[in-house]
């Protein structure tokens, strides 16, 4: 039977109705600080913990519930003779229900509060009570989520006690709650730079907090279950995770992956640009005078693959752009915004998933990345691979001309465009570019020469006079020879092959230009 509950919450959602239901059952309510005040003002009978323990709050409220009469009442094992003797000797009544959620530490961090303020929002007594109650879940219920208030109250009203199954459910939730709280603190402190020490690039212990945003219909395939988890803080750069879904069917696992690929690609450009993604790799990229023109030019690179694709634009969508978008079946579109006419035009495509990411319209120079946002995580059974995200880029002055002929001004422009795109194509990656757009893309092949052949074979546009980007060096001259045969006139690649001399000789023989970046962009 539940006779006594300790209630101390920062999130007061649903607090008063829940407390009234407990009080109506004859449950004695103990409380502290703001929670006690809220209950008293609502007319709910409540006893202050200080009165209960005969020990007032001290140290400005830092010590409220850290008392044997509180934790003895929570932790004692009912029916165990030695525990029964201890609590009887010390006059410690049982506490059967603990209702606690913790100081808003994450909210303070997200709001950019000073370090000292954030430290004061680190809860001590709350997690201690939650862990005590969860450890003793055989006898005590612990509620950390207001969403569980109705379930708990209804069960108590029906049986005056919580079932083993309910207490175990609450126990799991409680430990997840405190684990996430501690991980948030660790993550914040790990990333903090001080005059004495910079944050560890890869800390000895990696703590991260993700909360389930929603279940997915399935994972990559229908036989795989899936869910989407969101980080505690929204990044300052554009984010699929925090983008607003304006219309369309629910997002799938594959949609989210493809949207991220599209977003990453379009974020390479300050100019008005569009990226079309299919199966997590670009099938068309272009800049344009308008967003609509950029999409139309990107689509022309591979119109067959663009069907059913994912589109990212870095400028707001107007009615003219919406008209272009509705001319093709698309799964998703993400952009900084949509005007009213565009929304009306796109509404006819009821299944089209429309996402808005306002930060996508801001200048790239304004984006800031916290240390944890510069990392990429991949799980393997029993481990986690962690690396820096591939945010590398090159300028013209970073490149070394490898051939006798240097690129023309137009070739330089096309080469640097191809280099921005090729890092987002699955390796082995080849991109033909001309006039600020891709004209052919080949990727995902197990040999570089086959990626060249694939790009040329699939090309819907004329590749003659184009410039080519390669994500890694050419191990043999055959790939370059195929590029020459296709009519391209310049190549940008990392360089560094044992056979660079052969590769350069093939380029010189054909009179084409080749430059080396010294930077590889493998994408597995």
Swiss-Prot record:
CDD domains: IMPCH (cd01421). Residues 1-144 form the MGS-like domain. The keyword Metal-binding does not apply. Keywords: Hydrolase, Multifunctional enzyme, Purine biosynthesis, Transferase. One of its GO terms (cellular component) is cytosol. Pathway: Purine metabolism; IMP biosynthesis via de novo pathway; 5-formamido-1-(5-phospho-D-ribosyl)imidazole-4-carboxamide from 5-amino-1-(5-phospho-D-ribosyl)imidazole-4-carboxamide (10-formyl THF route): step 1/1; Purine metabolism; IMP biosynthesis via de novo pathway; IMP from 5-formamido-1-(5-phospho-D-ribosyl)imidazole-4-carboxamide: step 1/1. The keyword Transferase applies. GO terms for molecular function: IMP cyclohydrolase activity; phosphoribosylaminoimidazolecarboxamide formyltransferase activity. Gene3D superfamilies: 3.40.140.20, Methylglyoxal synthase-like domain (3.40.50.1380). InterPro entries: AICAR_Tfase_dup_dom_sf, Cytidine_deaminase-like, MGS-like_dom, MGS-like_dom_sf, PurH-like. Its EC number is 2.1.2.3, 3.5.4.10. Pfam families: AICARFT_IMPCHas (PF01808), MGS (PF02142). It catalyses: (6R)-10-formyltetrahydrofolate + 5-amino-1-(5-phospho-beta-D-ribosyl)imidazole-4-carboxamide = 5-formamido-1-(5-phospho-D-ribosyl)imidazole-4-carboxamide + (6S)-5,6,7,8-tetrahydrofolate; IMP + H2O = 5-formamido-1-(5-phospho-D-ribosyl)imidazole-4-carboxamide. GO terms for biological process: 'de novo' IMP biosynthetic process. Signal peptide: none annotated. Belongs to the PurH family. The IMP cyclohydrolase activity resides in the N-terminal region. This is Bifunctional purine biosynthesis protein PurH. It comes from Anaeromyxobacter dehalogenans (strain 2CP-C). The lineage of its organism: Bacteria, Pseudomonadati, Myxococcota, Myxococcia, Myxococcales.
């Amino acid at each position: 039977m539940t006779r006594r509950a300790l209630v101390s919450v920062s999130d007061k959602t649903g607090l008063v109705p829940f407390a009234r239901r407990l009080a109506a059952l004859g449950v004695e309510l103990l409380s502290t600080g703001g929670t006690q005040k809220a209950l008293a003002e609502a007319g709910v009978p409540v006893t202050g913990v200080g009165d209960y323990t005969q020990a007032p709050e001290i140290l400005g409220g830092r010590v409220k519930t850290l008392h044997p009469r509180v934790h003895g009442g929570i932790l004692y094992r009912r029916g165990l003779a030695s525990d029964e003797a201890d609590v009887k000797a010390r006059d410690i009544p049982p506490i059967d229900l603990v209702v606690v959620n913790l100081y808003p530490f994450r909210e303070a961090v997200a709001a950019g509060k000073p370090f000292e303020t954030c430290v004061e929002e680190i809860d001590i007594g709350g997690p201690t009570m939650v862990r005590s109650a969860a450890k003793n879940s055989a006898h005590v219920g612990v509620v950390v989520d207001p969403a569980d208030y109705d379930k708990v109250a209804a069960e108590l009203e029906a049986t005056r006690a919580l079932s083993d199954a309910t207490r175990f459910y609450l126990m799991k939730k409680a430990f997840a709650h405190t684990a996430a709280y501690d991980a948030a603190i660790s993550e914040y402190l790990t990333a903090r730079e001080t005059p004495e020490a910079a944050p560890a690039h890869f800390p000895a212990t990696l703590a991260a907090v993700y909360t389930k945003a929603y279940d997915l219909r399935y994972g990559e395939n229908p036989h795989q279950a899936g869910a989407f988890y969101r980080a505690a803080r929204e990044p300052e750069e554009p984010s699929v995770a925090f983008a607003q879904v304006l219309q369309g069917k629910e997002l799938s696992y594959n949609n989210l992956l493809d949207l991220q690929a599209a977003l990453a690609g379009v974020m390479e450009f300050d100019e008005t640009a569009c990226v079309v993604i299919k199966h997590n790799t670009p099938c068309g990229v272009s800049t344009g005078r308008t967003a609509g023109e950029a999409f139309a030019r990107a689509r022309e690179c591979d119109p067959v693959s663009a069907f059913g694709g994912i589109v990212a634009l870095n400028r707001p969508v107007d009615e003219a752009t919406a008209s272009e978008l509705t001319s093709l079946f698309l799964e998703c579109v993400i952009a900084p915004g949509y005007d009213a006419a565009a929304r009306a035009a796109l509404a006819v495509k009821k299944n089209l998933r429309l996402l808005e990411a306002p930060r996508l319209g801001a200048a790239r120079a304004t984006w800031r990345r916290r240390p944890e946002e510069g990392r990429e995580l991949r799980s393997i059974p029993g481990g986690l691979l962690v690396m820096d995200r591939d945010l590398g880029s090159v300028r013209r002055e970073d490149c070394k001309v490898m051939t006798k002929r240097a690129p023309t001004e137009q070739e330089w422009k096309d080469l640097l465009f191809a280099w921005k795109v090729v890092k987002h194509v699955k390796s082995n990656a080849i991109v033909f570019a001309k006039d600020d757009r891709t004209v052919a893309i080949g990727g995902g092949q197990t040999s570089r020469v086959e990626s060249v052949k694939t790009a040329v074979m699939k090309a819907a546009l004329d590749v003659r006079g184009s410039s080519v980007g390669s994500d890694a060096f050419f191990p043999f001259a055959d790939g370059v020879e195929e590029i020459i045969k296709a009519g391209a006139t310049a190549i940008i690649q990392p360089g560094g092959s044992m056979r660079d001399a052969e590769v350069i000789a093939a380029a010189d023989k054909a009179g084409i230009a080749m430059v080396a970046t010294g930077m590889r962009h493998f994408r597995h």
